[in-house]
Amino acid sequence: SDVYKRQGADMNLMRSDKRPVAEVDYGFVGDVKEVNADLLASLIHQGIVPVLAPLTHDKQGHMLNTNADTIAGEAAKALAKHFEVTLMFCFEKKGVLLDENDDESVIPEIDRIAFKGYVEQGIIQGGMIPKLENAYQAIDAGVKQVIITQASEIHQGKGTRVF
């Protein structure tokens, strides 16, 4: 299959709104509002693998930086209307960890109750919180499963399964 390298802004694949200034001005950061699921599905049906960079636009010509996990989650949610989708978040760790200093302390499965408890205990913090929030939003939108893992372990079935 061919690889189609694009950003969310290309071909109007994704439209975002500039994040409003509240306590913090995030600058040119976009929150995804719309995904062209039919176009993404059409590319896949043509044997094209879309690779999306985390840049979107606001329909007024402004490019916006968008969280990469959000781009992946929004694309997965849109594609779940056309396909059975597994969303895989790949990053430098082997999965969600009980101890951020112990790479072997991978939590094999995590549900919403455990997630909330780990956040309250300070075990899950920082960037892992929005990653898991994106995972649960994807599941709620029909994504079959979400796996958080290291890219090197993607085909080994390792990591954390989110449900």
Question: What is the meaning of each model-derived region?
Answer:
Residues 1, 5-163:
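C-terminal catalytic "cap/lid" subdomain
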